[in-house]
């Protein structure tokens, strides 16, 4: 690590997983990861709506009181959703750890789920989230790649779009399903692990009900295909490759190589990344341009170059450095044997065109 060596350990108290990494700084970050992302959703968008319900009124505190108290302590809360998790997090001064452990526990255990909050706050916020995502052609391309590749499970939409009706009872039922000990992991950054474990055991987190672990229960079956979406603004052409866990190192190095100065065509690549899940991953690459003709030319060049084969071993140390820096500030570090990454040759892939699709290529033209 580039900073001082940090001690990391995991504890399992009554099926509740707790992991922490201490540090010498004055600021701590506490996260509660819930295995309840969109891949596990009982209805499209219910995970997003549940995430948006976090930090509203609970049985012990009003939303206003919760916000005001945290502000007086200089802290802040956040709730996010992705395909794997709903994550509740708080950033605060180290000495205020007990308050924020109890605050997050209160949200998971005693959120009130009041009808007026759904209509007046949760739905408008979720609708805004979806509108922002729809306005971004890269986000639209990513959503389409997942839909094409997985169809179900990981292919479900992350954000609520209003297509499938979700009621307050649906949200409460989903909370009951995912807010259980088996689906919750408490992560601390800049926090002493023994202290965190003690405060967690003294909080309502220890009183969460038992349930069924959802990890690995999502449908990760993959498919081949392409999609084309008309979209005003910039045009995006994107490809995706499903990745087995055994190949994570190769695609991690590849993603970082493609956006580095080590790759001659990196100026053409808008974004490349590897999304890692419990049962596999998805590598995706995006080309973006205000002109569809340029996006078309760029994706053809990049795909042709990758089909010819690349020696990505030159990027192993670059990728290792980036990963080390990220791990240094992560409560849950990623461990990959990057030295195994050598040659890469692009084979089958899924393809999505977003924007001026009349002037973007089809998959069989790449």
Swiss-Prot record:
One of its GO terms (biological process) is mitochondrial electron transport, ubiquinol to cytochrome c. It is a peripheral membrane protein. Residues 1-15 form a transit peptide. This is Cytochrome b-c1 complex subunit 2, mitochondrial. Keywords: Electron transport, Membrane, Mitochondrion, Mitochondrion inner membrane, Respiratory chain, Transit peptide, Transport. GO terms for cellular component: mitochondrial crista; mitochondrion; respiratory chain complex III. It comes from Eremothecium gossypii (strain ATCC 10895 / CBS 109.51 / FGSC 9923 / NRRL Y-1056) (Yeast). One of its GO terms (molecular function) is metal ion binding. It comes from the Eukaryota. Component of the ubiquinol-cytochrome c oxidoreductase, a multisubunit transmembrane complex that is part of the mitochondrial electron transport chain which drives oxidative phosphorylation. It is found in: Mitochondrion inner membrane. The lineage of its organism: Eukaryota, Fungi, Dikarya, Ascomycota, Saccharomycotina. Component of the ubiquinol-cytochrome c oxidoreductase (cytochrome b-c1 complex, complex III, CIII), a multisubunit enzyme composed of 3 respiratory subunits cytochrome b, cytochrome c1 and Rieske protein, 2 core protein subunits, and additional low-molecular weight protein subunits. The complex exists as an obligatory dimer and forms supercomplexes (SCs) in the inner mitochondrial membrane with cytochrome c oxidase (complex IV, CIV). Pfam families: Peptidase_M16 (PF00675), Peptidase_M16_C (PF05193). Disulfide bonds: none annotated. Belongs to the peptidase M16 family. UQCRC2/QCR2 subfamily.
């Amino acid at each position: 690590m580039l900073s001082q060596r940090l001690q990391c350990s995991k504890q399992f108290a009554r099926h509740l997983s707790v992991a922490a990494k201490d540090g010498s700084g004055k600021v701590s970050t506490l996260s509660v990861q819930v295995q309840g992302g969109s891949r596990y959703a009982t209805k499209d968008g219910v995970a997003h709506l549940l995430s948006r319900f976090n930090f509203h009124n609970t049985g012990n505190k009003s939303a206003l009181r919760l916000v005001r108290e945290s502000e007086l302590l200089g802290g802040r809360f956040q709730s996010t959703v992705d395909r794997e998790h709903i994550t509740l997090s708080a950033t605060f001064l180290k000495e205020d750890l007990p308050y924020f452990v109890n605050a997050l526990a209160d949200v998971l255990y005693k959120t009130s789920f009041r009808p007026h909050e759904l209509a007046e706050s949760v739905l408008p916020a979720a609708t805004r989230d979806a509108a922002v995502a729809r306005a971004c052609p890269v986000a639209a391309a990513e959503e389409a790649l997942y839909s094409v590749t997985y169809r179900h499970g990981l292919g479900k939409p992350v954000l609520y779009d209003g297509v499938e009706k979700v009621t307050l009872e649906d949200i409460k039922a989903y909370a009951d399903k995912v807010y259980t000990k088996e689906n919750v992991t408490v992560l601390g950054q800049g926090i002493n692990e023994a202290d965190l474990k003690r405060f967690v055991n003294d909080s309502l987190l220890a009183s969460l009900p038992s349930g069924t672990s959802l990890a690995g229960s999502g449908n990760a079956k993959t498919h081949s295909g392409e999609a084309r979406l008309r979209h005003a603004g910039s045009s995006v052409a994107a490809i995706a490759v499903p990745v087995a866990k055994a190949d994570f190192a190769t695609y991690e190095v590849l993603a970082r190589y493609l956006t580095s100065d080590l790759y001659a065509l990196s100026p053409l690549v808008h974004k490349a990344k590897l999304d890692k899940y419990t049962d596999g991953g998805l590598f995706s690459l995006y080309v973006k341009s205000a002109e569809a003709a340029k996006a078309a030319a760029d994706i053809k060049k990049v795909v042709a170059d990758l089909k010819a084969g690349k020696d990505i071993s030159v990027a192993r140390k670059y990728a290792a450095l980036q990963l080390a820096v990220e791990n240094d500030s992560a409560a849950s570090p990623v461990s990959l044997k990057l030295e195994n990454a050598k040659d890469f040759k692009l084979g089958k892939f899924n393809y999505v065109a977003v924007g001026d699709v009349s002037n973007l290529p089809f998959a069989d033209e790449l």
